[in-house]
UniProtKB/Swiss-Prot annotation:
Family that this chain belongs to: Belongs to the peptidase S9B family.
A Pfam family hit: Peptidase_S9
Gene Ontology CC terms, in alphabetical order: cytosol
Descriptive protein name: Uncharacterized peptidase RP174
UniProt keywords, alphabetically: Hydrolase, Protease, Serine protease
Length: 722
């Protein structure tokens, strides 16, 4: 499935009161800063460019810059990088970027050839050449294969790092885009783009997609609000509108309900009322009237996939089903025909997974004859497999993972017997396994680059938060370092939107930071999904301060254990994580030495006015509601900034093309902080990266060069010879 899913009272601590001063007084003049609200406005771009140039010049003058640049470029452009892929009709398909192909290559090789150190790749689309031909940076965003005609794909793309996407039909046999094929261009020649407009094949001559065909077909969160069915050969203006959601909804999307081998005509339609509640429907495209039938399931339950004629649903809240209480976080399966029935008639429903205090659902993966249920047990992967025999689910078989603290990932097509599985952890590079039809895992690719895991330590520890709750965190360091309070330490967390932070392998972090004596820490604070729905809800809305307090608890524990001290403790976070670290800066500046605030959400009073802000109301609360506003103002980083307080050295990043978190957030924070004579700030604005580190490989490499130079210099990391 392609559905885009990515008890407490607020305690007002003394540090919160001190930081507030008078947050009813606006800290900037709205008239003077109005120009910063226009993402691509000439005055705003000039303002941002001047500050970006100044920051780049300062970073490049630091003694660590050249050495870090050399190391990071060697990692990014290394031909020995892990070759991730997916199996389709005897081939492994892979997307690859290097220094000669920064926009990337979509390519394939035979499965038998994939075992080799240097597979013989057949390039299908060269996105650098395509970008030159079009005259704009074209970024690859994914593909959708037509089962009825396996030689046809829909290639999703975007210009730069934008969330707005478009697609073109690709002929695998001719190795070229299809002339007059599916491509959202109007009769006037206008290319239609829309945020996350992934198309869905109905059959070889029909697709369903969510374009912005007319100006008013967007929601208040700036996502498409309409679904169309489009037949081959007809003008896009002639496409039939199937469904439209109200403007206050977030978005509408469509995908196949079941695999094409079972039914190609059934379409699952999701209308997102808010971030956690949905109106879901089934559309049978064989019905000439295209009537939508509403699914009878809890509104906050989400479709996770299908296997044969059964669908999997994840519950976010407790569900009283036939006088039985099914716990929030449970995964249930039921026959697709039961989706439309009343509760009393859902005879096929089966609970496949019930969460425990430490174990939560991660994802469902399927092959043609097998289901993989991946969970996190104390934020470490656990996997079982099972199947369906005579309409009964078989007993789950534990898939033994090769080492402790393993993290499991899977890429597969539901009509293929084989799948590629990746296993890794924070200090063990990824190994790719082939799941074969005999139900065995075979090593197919190991990391070709050298990294000696035996020289490093990965531990999971706990800190105690303000209310006694234990907050786990992972810590990585080089064997033999002394815990003398002087270790440069990077602490990361997210703490929002049910996102689970797990200890994946980061070659950059390990080789640039940990290898040089730095310490890396990943905190699993509340607001995330590491321990299920209640872990998230504990820091949702007016309870937001919980996430910040959890983060402070981990920070204080690192200092208490003499692992580091404020002078050497750096924190980084992006998007919601940017909000987290900026609040840490304003509420507890004495705890930290350096802060990277990346594509951050910072203007919490006006966030609904920018980008996708309207879609976040169920996460943060609504600043237009007095009680919500009261709580938001207590932590809102922009409103709580002081023009005299000495804050840690801070790096702020944003992007002109970020269509989720508008660059206004980063710009206004820099604008205000620049007036504080006691705080050193750096500011970097990208033109093309969108809500990420870069729209191509070179842009991403430069981003991390600047980031790690900033931390290495500010936190006094002593670089050894590379």
């Amino acid at each position: 499935m392609k559905k885009i899913i990515c008890y407490f009272t607020i305690i007002l601590l003394t540090f919160g009161i001190d930081a507030m001063e008078d947050n009813n007084k606006q800290i900037y003049n709205p008239k003077e800063t109005k120009f910063l609200e226009e993402a691509a406005g000439a005055e705003a771009l000039k303002w941002a460019k001047e500050r970006t140039n100044k920051t780049e010049k300062a970073l490049q003058a630091m003694q660590e810059y050249k050495r870090i640049k050399k190391e990071i470029e060697s990692i990014f452009y290394d031909q020995r990088k892990t070759l991730y892929g997916v199996i389709r009709k005897g081939y492994v398909y892979n997307f690859w970027m290097d220094d000669k192909n920064p926009q990337g290559l979509w390519r394939r090789t035979l499965v038998d050839n994939y075992y080799k150190d240097k597979p013989n790749w057949e390039v299908l689309i060269d996105f650098d050449k395509l970008s030159k031909k079009i005259g704009k940076k074209v970024a690859y965003r994914g593909v959708s294969n037509c089962v009825q005609n396996p030689n046809r794909y829909l290639i999703s793309m975007s210009f730069g790092g934008k969330d707005e996407m478009f697609f073109r039909e690709w002929d695998l046999e001719k190795k070229d885009f299809v002339k007059n094929g599916f491509e959202p261009i109007t009769s006037c020649g206008k290319l239609l783009e829309g945020k996350f407009t992934y198309p869905t094949w109905v059959n070889k001559d029909t697709i369903i997609f969510n374009p912005v065909l007319y100006k008013d077909e967007i929601t208040s969160s700036l996502y498409p609000n309409s679904l169309y069915i489009w037949k081959r050969g007809e003008a896009i203006e002639k496409a039939r509108k199937l469904f439209e959601v109200p403007k206050e909804y977030i978005r509408v999307s469509a995908d196949k309900l079941l695999s094409d081998a079972i039914s190609s005509s059934l379409i699952f339609i999701s209308a997102d009322k808010d971030f956690y509640n949905y109106d879901n429907y089934i559309l049978d495209t064989q019905d000439k009237n295209f009537k939508l039938q509403k699914i009878n399931m809890p509104s906050d339950a989400t479709l996770q996939g299908s296997f044969k004629e059964y669908v999997f649903w994840l519950l976010r809240s407790d569900w009283k089903f036939k006088n039985h209480n099914i716990k929030a976080g449970s995964l249930v399966a039921l026959h697709f025909t039961d989706l439309l029935k009343a509760e009393s008639d859902k005879t096929s429903l089966k609970i496949l997974f019930t969460p425990t205090e430490n174990e939560v659902f991660n994802f469902i993966g399927t092959t043609k004859d097998r289901v993989f249920l991946a969970t996190y047990d104390n934020v470490v992967s656990k996997v079982v497999t099972f199947t369906l025999e005579n309409e009964q689910w078989t007993k789950p078989v534990i898939l033994k993972l090769p080492y402790q603290n393993a993290i499991f990932r899977m890429s597969s097509y539901e009509d293929e017997e084989e799948a590629l599985i990746t296993i890794e952890n924070a200090i063990v590079p990824p190994t790719i396994y082939l799941w074969v039809k005999t139900h065995e895992l075979k090593v197919i690719r190991k990391a070709l680059y050298s990294f000696d895991s035996e020289n490093y330590v990965l531990e999971q520890k706990e800190a105690t938060s303000f209310d006694g709750v234990k907050i786990p965190y992972f810590i990585v360091y080089k064997k033999g370092i002394k815990f003398d309070g002087k270790n440069p330490t990077l602490l990361e967390a997210y703490g929002g939107f049910q996102v689970i932070n797990s200890p994946y392998f980061s070659r950059i972090k390990n080789e640039v930071w940990v290898k040089n004596g730095g310490v890396s820490v990943l905190a699993n604070i509340r607001g995330g999904g590491e321990f299920g729905p209640e872990w998230h809800k504990a820091a949702q809305g007016i309870k937001r301060q919980t996430a910040f307090n959890d983060f402070f608890a981990v920070s204080e524990e690192l200092i208490k254990q003499n692992i580091t001290s404020p002078e050497y403790l750096g924190i980084k976070g992006g998007s919601n994580g940017g909000l987290l670290v900026s609040v840490a800066m304003t509420q507890r500046p004495e705890l930290f030495g350096a802060i990277a605030c990346e594509v951050p959400i910072l203007d919490m009073i006006r966030y609904k006015e920018f980008g996708a802000g309207n879609s976040w109301v169920t996460e943060y609360g609504d600043p237009e509601i007095p009680n919500d506003l009261l709580h938001i103002k207590k932590y809102a980083p922009l409103e709580n900034l002081s023009l005299t307080q000495k804050y840690p050295t801070v790096l702020i990043t944003d992007s002109v093309l970020d269509q989720r978190v508008h660059p206004w957030h980063g710009r206004i924070f820099e604008y205000v902080l620049a007036q504080n004579p006691n705080t050193k700030t750096y500011f970097l604005e990208s033109r093309d990266s969108g809500h990420s580190s870069g729209s191509d490989l070179k842009e991403s490499a430069n981003y991390f060069i600047n980031l790690y130079t900033f931390f290495a210099n500010t936190l006094k990391l002593k670089l050894i010879k590379f």
